């Protein structure tokens, strides 16, 4: 009966996914007809998720219907050649035997019989035939891996349990006395084949560098931090990290021959990239570590090659090098899952890797508990573990066992970002990953999925759950396990978006010990250019003072740029100064008051201080559901990859394209102002200081180009305006990580002035680059080129600002705005909006960030007050009773009422600036922006 039920479930899943795939292919016409060049990828990238789901279900189906007596037959060699009569003659083998072999391989998809007389390549065989690295990979498996596997039983019988390097199945298979690496060094042909094999392994999805880049918070390290890449071979991993994180420096360590080869490779253009930040050092990791001022000691695919005794020696030398405060060890290696906790296909790959390590090295892949026991023997402890989705390796962050924990709470956290299943599941969509309940109380270790703690101990009075049903889009039925009757405020506040407002709210909650988690769709904090300034007025500074701890607020103040208030206007053609005024009324009761100038990248990093372990990147929300049981209401957020998170409240701080706004207030549409802007920054190099007007480097500078254009006949006068400001930092604070002094600038005008070459699909807001827009080098280069084209007739002194710009920081955006009068929607006790998600505004008023920060502080007060009112009775927490939920809904309604007032003032102030800078029409005349 159980097998029948399993078969039925898998078949239904296959049918459902097949319909989804066929529907997509029918509209997109992506799937190849089967004709044409062999080896062509038949699935588009957009179907990668469904393809993997279908492949996994198919593997499960095969396993369910395979008779045990047939299993070994399926494991017979999937190898062969590519033809029939002619091939038999060329290979000097009997045709009948050849045909039997090839038809067996065709039955397994390795080749394809196009007619009863002809055999051709399949995509798999074509890949081996045309890709030298893949060919060497296949040869390696055939010549070395398979023979070693064949003799595994012989080695076990001969030596039993052993960790000696030359007592392996490999030694029996090759009939050699030396260990694997010794034999490899002596055999040039094998060495070359092994190198190709490793290149092929490294190029696979499961071992891609992208998992290394996203699996650890490299962006949270202080700029200038030193990463020691222990056993880093040719430095390819360090260069990948250097490209993604320009503020970090790397030291690649390996044996002398390897380092010399790596240095020789630096003659290539590709290897010269980041040469100033990636240096090489000869070092044997079995000897004491010579670098003792490193911030991170990184070992990728190193420890799994060695048995425990040897691994302890390696780790002990690194432990002794942890001299710098906060220094850590990061290991990227396989963390074997418990059976059945990952997809069948991924588990198969990991089990094969485990056996290979035993057969060749007498080493092993380790489970989490084995890793924990290993590092504890060295006086280390696991601080954090991350398992990136799609990766065969996880990342273990280690610190000294007797050191103060680097993460809040002091507990190791095991985080899985793949299709993991756990014993305590609250919401599971067809096996997709589930973000489980937020654990409360203190336990020695808490395990989590996607960063939300879960443990059976988090359930008071035992597990008394019962199940309910929730409706999820596109017909998928999700099982929801409702929780036992315990305080709702042990669940976290879910903050969607790691922009300014979302992080400020997170800091407020952190300050008041209210559980929260932040989810950000960007894959990292440095995914897009954000290196330009924000102007914060007194009200915003007050909001920060209310939200941040004293230490973090002091760091904010120390990071502020030196502000000078005034305005200078230049003529774009002659380069002459038209007018200039210090103060300009900005310091009085009108205009900008008591402003702070901050670099947005630095500011955002400060707002992540102390909470980076609660921020999860690469999580894009698609919808939410408000659920109820007999005790309380709670919200379940569903992400693009199928993962879910459960919380006490959901805050949409996810920018102008907010999925939360579209669901909560679908009638609330943003407006297209008709303008486009290019943001940029130009570092104050000696050349810029020599060419750019000195009077333009004192305070805010405005250049208005009102040259008549043919468009003026059609659309009225259409000025192009440059707004720039010098950003200088005080170097009195040696601990502050600040960028070089630079000039912030923005070019803004009616869209008709900008060419189609510009990427204008994103939206700009009142406080900088819109976080909804993905960044890439090509779009940055196009933006920089557009700035030069628009200012081609300008005076050379002014144009030097664009000629010397940091091209990587240029970005072009469409300017959108919410209407000044926001709609009134029914408030509830589970969901609300913040910042650009609800009241995007033109940057011309310079107040978007101010309004967003005040939003965050005011919402934080709501959570703090409700937490305080329920402190005496933890069981009857916020929302725990109907009366509590009603009270929370009333407080949210009051918050949203004040938010509408703030939004009206900010949007109207921005309108005044927009009208002056690019001639914005009235809001009634604007079209709805398609976002």
Swiss-Prot record:
EC number: 2.1.1.-, 1.-.-.-
Coiled coil: none
Pathway entry: Secondary metabolite biosynthesis
Residues annotated to bind FAD: 520, 604, 836, 849
Chain intervals for the UniProt region annotation (Disordered): 455-474
Binding site for S-adenosyl-L-methionine: 254
InterPro entries reported for this sequence: COMT-like (IPR016461), FAD-bd (IPR002938), FAD/NAD-bd_sf (IPR036188), O_MeTrfase_dom (IPR001077), SAM-dependent_MTases_sf (IPR029063)
Record keywords, A-Z: FAD, Flavoprotein, Methyltransferase, Monooxygenase, Multifunctional enzyme, NAD, Oxidoreductase, S-adenosyl-L-methionine, Transferase
Superkingdom in the source lineage: Eukaryota
Disulphide linkage map: none
Protein induction: Expression is up-regulated during the late stage of P.nodorum wheat leaf infection and is controlled by the cluster specific transporter elcR.
Span list, region O-methyltransferase: 1-463
GO biological process terms held by the UniProt record: methylation; secondary metabolite biosynthetic process
Annotated segments matching region FAD-dependent monooxygenase: 464-931
Gene Ontology terms for molecular function: FAD binding; monooxygenase activity; O-methyltransferase activity
Active site: 304 (proton acceptor)
Biased composition (Polar residues): 462-474
Catalyzed reaction equations: nor-toralactone + S-adenosyl-L-methionine = toralactone + S-adenosyl-L-homocysteine + H(+); toralactone + NADH + O2 + H(+) = 1-(3,4,5-trihydroxy-7-methoxynaphthalen-2-yl)propan-2-one + CO2 + NAD(+)
Function: Dual O-methyltransferase/FAD-dependent monooxygenase; part of the gene cluster that mediates the biosynthesis of elsinochrome C, a perelyenequinone phytotoxin structurally similar to cercosporin. The first step of elsinochrome C biosynthesis is performed by the polyketide synthase elcA which catalyzes the formation of nor-toralactone.
PANTHER family with a match to the protein in the record: DUAL O-METHYLTRANSFERASE_FAD-DEPENDENT MONOOXYGENASE ELCB, PUTATIVE (AFU_ORTHOLOGUE AFUA_4G14580)-RELATED
Family, similarity comment: In the C-terminal section; belongs to the paxM FAD-dependent monooxygenase family. In the N-terminal section; belongs to the class I-like SAM-binding methyltransferase superfamily. Cation-independent O-methyltransferase family. COMT subfamily.
UniProt name for this protein: Dual O-methyltransferase/FAD-dependent monooxygenase elcB
Species in which this protein is naturally found: Phaeosphaeria nodorum (strain SN15 / ATCC MYA-4574 / FGSC 10173) (Glume blotch fungus)
Species lineage: Eukaryota, Fungi, Dikarya, Ascomycota, Pezizomycotina
Annotated gene: elcB
